[in-house]
């Protein structure tokens, strides 16, 4: 069982060709599709589905949801990177469990005010030594998980932003013969995973002067699903 949309471990040698050409490897196999999702709203499915299909090498799927949310994309433009995130966490945690997701392990150090919060090795976040149902994880670690609401941080256009612009190590051309036909295919799948961790809303925590190309694309193509919030 697997999902080519969530194939995000090429750095460890995983090959998307196994999904794309499954019957070439197992000619007697029967492929069954799971078409219903019980986590995401119809709107998130539509947004994420349109986003991932910009990749050339993905299997087109029709997914169904039984819930609807009017504007699940919350664009939060901050003035103070740490203070405004503190405010946002306190607001969102009152609505249920929260995942704070980012592209890189070290991103949280720039964003979280450690004078207010504490964080353990598992990414659990504490306020006054009390767990507040908020976790910080990289998107890779969050695969398979869910929360009532998700906050995405470090959505900037830079080498270590999202998408991450580091080039693959040369060794991968020897261990993995699959080639991306457009730039950032794996990063796009990773962003898809981030978008689909939420049961309700996604909060994009944004620096108005430096915004990820993925976020710009989401904004351009999904304006009716977006609520803008200025801190």
Predicted regions and their residues:
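Short glycine-/polar-rich loops that comprise or flank the Walker A/P-loop
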Residues: 3-5, 26-31, 70-72, 132-134, ...
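Inter-lobe coupling/hinge region of RecA-like P-loop helicase motors
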Residues: 28-36, 57-103, 134
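Conserved helicase C-terminal RecA-like lobe
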Residues: 94, 142-208, 216-217
């Amino acid at each position: 069982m697997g999902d080519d949309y969530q194939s995000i471990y090429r750095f460890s040698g995983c090959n998307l060709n196994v999904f794309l050409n499954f019957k070439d490897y197992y000619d007697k196999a029967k492929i069954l599709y799971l078409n219903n999702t019980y986590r995401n709203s119809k709107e998130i499915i539509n947004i994420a589905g349109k986003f991932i299909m910009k990749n050339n090498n993905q299997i087109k799927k029709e997914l169904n949801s039984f819930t609807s949310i009017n504007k699940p994309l919350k664009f939060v433009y901050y003035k103070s990177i740490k203070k405004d995130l503190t405010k946002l966490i306190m607001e969102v945690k009152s609505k249920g469990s929260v995942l704070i997701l980012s592209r890189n392990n070290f991103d949280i150090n720039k964003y979280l005010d450690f004078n207010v919060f504490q964080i353990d090795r598992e990414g659990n976040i504490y306020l006054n030594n009390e767990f507040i149902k908020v976790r910080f994880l990289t998107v890779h670690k969050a695969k398979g998980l869910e929360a009532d609401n998700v906050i995405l941080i470090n959505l900037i256009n830079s080498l270590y932003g999202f998408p991450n612009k580091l080039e693959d190590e040369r060794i991968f051309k020897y261990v993995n013969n699959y080639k991306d036909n457009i730039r950032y295919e794996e990063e796009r799948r990773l962003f898809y995973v981030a978008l689909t961790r939420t049961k309700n809303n996604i909060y994009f925590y944004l620096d108005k002067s430096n915004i990820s190309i993925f976020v710009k694309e989401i904004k351009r193509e999904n304006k009716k699903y977006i609520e803008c919030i200025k801190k």
